[in-house]
Amino acid sequence: MTRYTAPTQDIQYLLHDVLDVANDPTPGYAELEPDFTSAVLEEAGKIAGEVLHPLNAVGDQEGCVLENGVVRPPKGFKEAFDQVREGGWTALDLPEQYGGQNMPYLLGTAVGEMFSGANQAFTMYQGLTHGAASAILVHGTDQQKDTYLPKMFSCDWTGTMNLTEPHCGTDLGLMRSKAVPQDDGSYAISGQKIFISAGEHDMAENIIHLVLAKIPGGPEGIKGVSLFIVPKFLVKEDGSLGERNGVKCSKIEEKMGIHGNSTCVMDYDGAKGWLLGEEHKGMRAMFTMMNEARIGVGMQGLAQAEVAYQNALDYARDRLQGRSVTGVENPDGPADPLIVHPDIRRNLLDQKSFIEGARAFLLWGAQMIDRAERGKDEAAHGMVSLLTPVIKGFLTDEGYDMTVQAQQVYGGHGYIEETGMSQFTRDARIAMIYEGANGVQALDLVGRKLAQDGGKHVMAFFDLVKGFIKEAGTDGAMAEFTEPLKSASKDLQSAGMFFMQNGMKNPNAALAGSYDFMHLFGHVCLGLMWGRMAEASLKALAEGRGDANFHETKLATARFYMTRRLPATKLHLARIESGADPVMALDADRF
């Protein structure tokens, strides 16, 4: 059986030592005092470790069952969902007006990582509802908000997003689902959607589907797509539930992972729906949910890496195999523990340095979202737009790789289902695909985000890194951290310059290097985070604050990242500068 322990100490350190929330003027941050955040994180950690994680393997083994049109989730899910709902965890960072607790998104993200690490499939029921509610909050009418949000905030009603159809995934302009206007102002929605997470279940009274469809006679392609609210049960004027709507689950998808989440084929047969936002502006409204979801999916990559690492570390400490090359370290046993061997340590430090750097990056991104949304900071809004594809793509690619490395620590036992390690790998795999496949994230980064607003957001990022290096210093105790970061940042700038010089005359040159650019950017972001953590821990040690062992460990891990992982930027730059020719040399029929 696997275990999960919420990383509360690390999150507290990031909030208060690194992100310095006490001195952040963003509205709502004044209440984020150490005692308060500690209490929230400790309670959330208990739920994650004691309630959600014990159901993780249950969900994987049992999956969901479709019976007479109703999906039954795995044993224990419904009771756990009630417990999460009753504890107020479903609307931690949503507005009080509709029943939320109005805490910063930063704190909600920290709690979300814990829940996702404990049980990703379970947490998706809540997470998708959060995203759907956010879309209604931004684009809905007052009546729609009053009707749906209180129940969705509490998760008495859950939510979904319906985009994909059998013949169209990334290219939603090929969509065939139709929305025919009705005399009462509603629309009759017809079509089939696939891969719909949490599309049907019995853990909530109602399910509010957000569905993309085309109104007949509208513009061709993506410009003709609109977004609709389609409830499972129609809602009466007094808020009570009426008759069943014309939407049903016809099949549960058989998947590689996240078996505990009901991934459904949804059939719409003249279902009653209501326009959310403007006609033919559906993608604008849906992207409110999609952008939030992409941050959440990046979080999933980190979360699965964390839980896999915890179990791999336990195994490396307990499993006796071979002797240390420098001498026996466990004379009373038949062999030394795995963790004495350099390659196992390299493996574990790859994981540890990624996870802790990624957590800092994710929470910094959440802080930027708070500054943009709560503080109306336009610069922060631009930074979030720039970094969203990096958070989604880099964290899920690397997060998946780390679950594989954790599995590798177990050797053959990692390949056996009994240990539970394969579930982390299987569950992590989908995060590289849904909410925009990572190749698409890379194209978005290079094709749109770099040049957005005249390139001022990427220049702001370069200035941020440069400012940190200048302030921290390139000599003294910080030099071993700032010098590698400075070099990596130059690699990122060189890659950006290559795209500027070659992208217009040869678009394939930019597109062929986009994936490497996303990873190069991700490494620089984590390098910046490790620089900030090194600075914070050096300061804490100098002042005699906190746990000295914790801070020394941070510094050792920072050194590992700077010397062993950050140099990957040079590999990515070399690939980018090789241009399109190596990628495009073969005609399609020669593959």
From Swiss-Prot:
Induction: Expression is up-regulated in the presence of DMSP. Coiled coil: none annotated. Its EC number is 1.3.99.41. Its cofactor is FAD. It catalyses: 3-(methylsulfanyl)propanoyl-CoA + oxidized [electron-transfer flavoprotein] + H(+) = 3-(methylsulfanyl)acryloyl-CoA + reduced [electron-transfer flavoprotein]. Keywords: FAD, Flavoprotein, Oxidoreductase. It comes from the Bacteria. Optimum temperature is 40 degrees Celsius. The active site is at residue 435. GO terms for molecular function: flavin adenine dinucleotide binding; oxidoreductase activity, acting on the CH-CH group of donors. It is an enzyme of class 1 (oxidoreductase). Optimum pH is 9.0. InterPro entries: Acyl-CoA_dh-like_C_dom (IPR025878), Acyl-CoA_Oxase/DH_mid-dom (IPR006091), Acyl-CoA_Oxase/DH_mid-dom_sf (IPR046373), AcylCo_DH-like_C (IPR036250), AcylCo_DH/oxidase_C (IPR009075), AcylCoA_DH/ox_N (IPR013786), AcylCoA_DH/ox_N_sf (IPR037069), AcylCoA_DH/oxidase_NM_dom_sf (IPR009100). Pfam families: Acyl-CoA_dh_1, Acyl-CoA_dh_C, Acyl-CoA_dh_M, Acyl-CoA_dh_N. Belongs to the acyl-CoA dehydrogenase family. Each monomer consists of four domains: an N-terminal alpha-helical domain, a ten-stranded beta sheet domain, a central alpha-helical domain and a C-terminal alpha-helical domain. PANTHER family: ACYL-COA DEHYDROGENASE, BROAD-SPECIFICITY LINEAR ACYL-COA DEHYDROGENASE FADE5. Homodimer. This is 3-methylmercaptopropionyl-CoA dehydrogenase. It comes from Roseovarius nubinhibens (strain ATCC BAA-591 / DSM 15170 / ISM). The gene is dmdC.
